[in-house]
């Protein structure tokens, strides 16, 4: 037996069927010759903008295409730390598999295969970390929303330390979450993204110098190592870009609730926190995300726009000297 979802058309206010994509089915009101303008309008959770593969969110309220914050940062901000990390990872992988490398080097075909395998070491590691990070974020969201966690995830021994340390963080700092995995947007600067969470904490408020009821932006990072520093002094796994990303989410004026309702965002503190969550424990870092950091985000956006637009037309075709011109010069 199947059930058909129905909802009120926002235009004609009549009950209509809802398509699988969350839009009102095409319908024509009684006495009209043309379909109702409400046909095809998204309702419920379908009103929440989703990130496309091209890196844009489409707002169903205004029809605007809003560039993804992460896309902007990926295209406009250098990743120097990743270059060093990738080089170190390939070197470590080679040393761990030295006997196989020696054997493979004796034949051209196997040597090429091993070279290609080494070149992809950083990709494999990123995918592995990405899967872990996604799963941990799903666990955190379930904890925040007090919803059931699938047994396959909850009983995974690799994830149990993360859950325990996250719960310890919540207890230690008396955390109350007010939003999680929320899509936010700013029409003036034409961007959108999904923030990790907003929280309140009397202990954090005292540390950061803000009212106890102030919303504090938060993010979780699962990579790197606790208390480890990179060659340039950054925390291994928590980078300045986290504050830049957070500054954009803080600047966003609108957000979408889980039922699809668009709301104005409340004031958020100019200092957020990044939870560095690892199996061996956690660290909580204050991260600046005020207007001065957001200004840096606007510069990064301009670089991203250059890289995806004008940069493609900077270098022209190679010039060739015509024979007649060559003879005249001679």
Residue ranges of each PLM-predicted region?
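Metal-dependent nuclease catalytic cores that hydrolyze phosphodiester bonds in DNA/RNA
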Residues: 2, 44-192
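Mg2+/Mn2+-dependent nuclease catalytic core
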Residues: 178, 182-309
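Charged phosphate-binding loop/patch that engages nucleotide di/tri-phosphates or the phosphate backbone
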Residues: 306-325
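Cys/His-rich microdomains that often coordinate metals
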Residues: 16, 40-43
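Short cysteine-rich clusters marking metal-coordination/redox-active sites
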Residues: 9-12, 36
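Cysteine-rich micro-motifs
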Residues: 22-39
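Short metal-coordination and nucleic-acid-contact micro-motifs, chiefly zinc-binding Cys/His arrays
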Residues: 3-5, 29-32, 249
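Short intrinsically disordered terminal tails
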Residues: 1-3, 208-211, 328-330
């Amino acid at each position: 037996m199947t059930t058909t979802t129905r909802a009120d058309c926002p235009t004609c206010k009549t009950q209509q069927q809802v398509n699988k994509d969350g839009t009102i089915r095409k319908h024509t009101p009684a006495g009209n010759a043309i379909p109702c303008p409400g046909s095809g309008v998204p309702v419920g959770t379908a009103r929440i903008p989703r990130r496309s593969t091209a890196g844009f969110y489409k707002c169903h309220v205004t029809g605007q295409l809003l560039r993804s914050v992460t896309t902007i940062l990926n295209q406009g901000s250098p990743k120097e730390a990743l270059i060093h990390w990738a080089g170190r990872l390939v070197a470590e992988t080679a040393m761990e598999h030295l006997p196989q490398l020696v054997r493979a080097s004796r034949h051209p075909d196997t040597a090429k295969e091993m070279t290609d395998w080494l070149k992809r070491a950083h990709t494999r590691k990123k995918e592995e970390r990405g899967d872990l990070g996604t799963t941990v974020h799903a666990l955190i969201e379930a904890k925040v929303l007090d919803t059931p966690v699938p047994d396959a995830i909850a009983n995974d021994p690799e994830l149990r330390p993360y859950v325990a340390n996250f719960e310890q963080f919540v207890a230690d700092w008396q955390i109350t979450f007010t939003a999680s995995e929320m899509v936010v947007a700013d029409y003036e600067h034409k961007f959108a993204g999904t923030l990790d969470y907003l929280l309140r904490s009397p202990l954090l408020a005292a540390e950061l110098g803000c009212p106890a009821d102030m919303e504090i932006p938060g993010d979780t990072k699962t990579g790197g190592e606790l208390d480890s520093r990179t060659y340039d002094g950054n925390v291994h796994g928590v980078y300045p870009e986290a504050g830049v990303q957070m500054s954009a989410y803080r600047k966003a004026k609108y957000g979408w609730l889980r039922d699809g309702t668009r709301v104005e965002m409340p004031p958020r503190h100019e200092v957020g926190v990044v939870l560095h969550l690892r199996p061996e424990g956690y660290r909580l870092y204050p991260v600046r995300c005020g207007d001065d950091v957001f200004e840096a985000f606007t510069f990064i956006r301009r670089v991203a726009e250059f890289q995806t637009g004008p940069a493609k037309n900077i270098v022209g075709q190679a010039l060739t000297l015509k024979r007649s011109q060559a003879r005249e010069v001679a």
